[in-house]
Amino acid sequence: MAEKSTVKVDEVKLNLIEMVLRAYDPUYSCAAHIIVKDEKGNKIIEVIKE
């Protein structure tokens, strides 16, 4: 089983990601799961709204 790592993301970066997502998808607020990957496809941020 793969280890799950938790990365702490500061609130400013998280708000910036949210602004960009809302600009492209007005229904973003419906989303519950966001994954951000780098150029190689490695997951760098995962946000789960509860």
UniProtKB/Swiss-Prot annotation:
<dbReference type="GO" id="GO:0016491">
    <property type="term" value="F:oxidoreductase activity"/>
</dbReference>
<keyword id="KW-0560">Oxidoreductase</keyword>
<dbReference type="InterPro" id="IPR029014">
    <property type="entry name" value="NiFe-Hase_large"/>
</dbReference>
<feature type="binding site">
    <location>
        <position position="27"/>
    </location>
    <ligand>
        <name>Ni(2+)</name>
    </ligand>
</feature>
<keyword id="KW-0479">Metal-binding</keyword>
<dbReference type="GO" id="GO:0046872">
    <property type="term" value="F:metal ion binding"/>
</dbReference>
<comment type="subunit">
    <text>The F420-non-reducing hydrogenase vhu is composed of four subunits; VhuA, VhuD, VhuG and VhuU.</text>
</comment>
<dbReference type="InterPro" id="IPR053438">
    <property type="entry name" value="F420-Hydrogenase_large-U"/>
</dbReference>
<keyword id="KW-0533">Nickel</keyword>
<comment type="similarity">
    <text>Belongs to the [NiFe]/[NiFeSe] hydrogenase large subunit family.</text>
</comment>
<feature type="binding site">
    <location>
        <position position="30"/>
    </location>
    <ligand>
        <name>Ni(2+)</name>
    </ligand>
</feature>
<protein>
    <recommendedName>
        <fullName>F420-non-reducing hydrogenase vhu subunit U</fullName>
        <ecNumber>1.12.99.-</ecNumber>
    </recommendedName>
</protein>
<feature type="propeptide" description="Removed in mature form">
    <location>
        <begin position="34"/>
        <end position="50"/>
    </location>
</feature>
<keyword id="KW-0712">Selenocysteine</keyword>
